[in-house]
Regions:
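Extended, charged catalytic domains and RNA/DNA-binding interfaces, predominantly
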Residues: 1-309
C-alpha cells in the first residue's frame, strides 16, 4: 500500500498492474479495526483453532485467482459469524469483563490482534519521511446503525451467558446504515489496540475513548466517510439513544470529528439532487445504495452540505 502511494506499481488481484498518475504527499492505511489480524491467523492451517478450516491457505498463490473470487467473498460474509459461533463460559466471562465482545469467541486471539496492530504502527513509522511523504497511524472504525438490543447495556450479560451467541450484526429498524470512521493518530503515541465496533457500535463511545486518550497525551481525530450510504443517519438530529442533539453534543462531536470525507470511489457525499434541486451538479457520482447492499439509502441526514447548513 505504501509503495503504491509513493508511485510504485502493484499487482491487482485479477492480475493487471496498477499505478497512480502522481505519487501522494501523505497517506494513512485504514484497515478495518475489528478482528484485525484474525484472517491471516485463521488462514494458517497449523493454527489449531477448530472452525477455521474454510479459511486455511486462503491467501496462498493458488487461491488468489479470478475463479476463487466468489468463494472468498462468501468467506468474508462469515467473518463476524465466526466470532458469534464459537464460545465457552470462560471466553464469555472475559468478553463481559473487558467489554470486548470479540473475546467471547474461542477463535479470537488478543495477542494476534495486538501484534497485527503493532505491525500497522511500525509500517507507518517505517515509511514516514517528513517533508516528502508523511504517514499517519490509522484504522477504520467500522460501525453501522444496525444496533443490536442484545449486545448493548445490561442485556449483554444475558446474551454472553446464554451460550447461543450474540447478534453482533444488529437488527431492524436501523437497517445497516454505514457509520464508518477513519481514526487517525497524531504524533508518536499510540494505543495497544484500536477501539472497534466489537467494543461498542455507538460512535459516541468512540468519542469518549478519544477524549480519554487526549487527556493522557494520545491525540486522535475521527473522519466520517461514505455518509451517503448511512441511510440518513450519519448527520441525523438525534443522538444514539434517540434524544434530540444539543450544543453539548455538537461540541463533543466537533472535538473528535473536525473533518468529514465528501467524495470517494463509492460515491459523493457532498449533496444529492433531492437536497439541492437547483444545483445542476448535484447528481455528480451519486450512489443511492447503502454500502455493501442494494437497499436504498435515504438522502436526508446523509450528505455534508445539508449537515453544515
Amino acid at each position: 500500500a505504501y509503495d503504491f502511494a509513493k508511485g510504485g506499481s502493484i499487482k491487482h488481484a485479477l492480475g493487471y498492474d496498477m499505478k497512480l498518475r502522481e505519487p501522494l504527499d501523505f497517506y494513512a492505511v485504514t484497515d478495518h479495526g475489528f478482528l484485525l489480524g484474525s484472517i491471516p491467523d485463521w488462514a494458517d492451517p497449523n493454527n489449531g483453532k477448530a472452525g477455521t478450516e474454510p479459511f486455511h491457505n486462503l491467501n496462498s498463490p493458488e487461491n488468489l485467482i479470478q475463479e476463487s473470487v466468489a468463494e472468498r467473498s462468501n468467506l468474508f460474509q462469515s467473518y463476524v459469524r465466526n466470532v458469534n459461533s464459537f464460545s465457552n463460559i470462560w471466553t464469555r466471562l472475559v468478553a463481559y469483563v473487558t467489554g470486548d465482545t470479540a473475546r467471547g469467541s474461542t477463535l479470537y486471539d488478543v495477542d494476534v490482534h495486538r501484534t497485527a496492530w503493532k505491525d500497522v504502527i511500525q509500517s507507518a513509522q517505517r515509511h514516514n519521511d517528513p517533508g516528502n511523504f508523511t504517514t499517519f497511524v490509522a484504522y477504520e472504525y467500522t460501525t453501522s446503525s444496525a444496533r443490536s438490543s442484545n449486545t448493548e447495556g445490561s442485556s449483554a450479560l444475558k446474551c454472553l451467558f446464554n451460550g447461543t451467541g450474540c447478534n453482533f450484526a444488529g437488527s431492524p429498524p436501523h437497517e445497516n446504515g454505514n457509520l464508518h470512521r477513519n481514526v487517525i493518530y497524531k504524533g508518536n503515541k499510540f494505543t495497544v489496540e484500536p477501539f472497534t465496533r466489537l467494543k461498542s457500535l455507538n460512535p459516541e463511545d468512540l468519542w469518549s475513548w478519544m477524549d480519554e486518550l487526549r487527556e493522557n497525551g494520545v491525540d486522535t481525530i475521527a473522519i466520517p466517510h461514505n455518509s451517503n450510504g448511512s441511510n440518513g443517519q450519519m448527520f441525523e438530529m438525534e443522538n444514539w439513544d434517540g434524544l434530540p442533539i444539543a450544543s453539548q453534543y455538537a461540541e463533543f462531536r466537533m472535538r473528535n470529528e473536525p473533518l468529514v470525507e465528501m467524495t470517494q470511489v463509492k460515491g459523493t457525499s457532498e449533496t444529492h439532487p433531492i437536497l439541492s434541486p437547483n444545483d445542476e451538479w448535484a447528481d455528480f457520482e451519486i450512489m443511492d445504495q447503502r454500502v455493501g447492499a442494494s437497499t436504498y439509502s435515504r438522502p436526508f441526514g446523509g450528505y455534508v452540505r445539508q449537515a453544515y447548513l
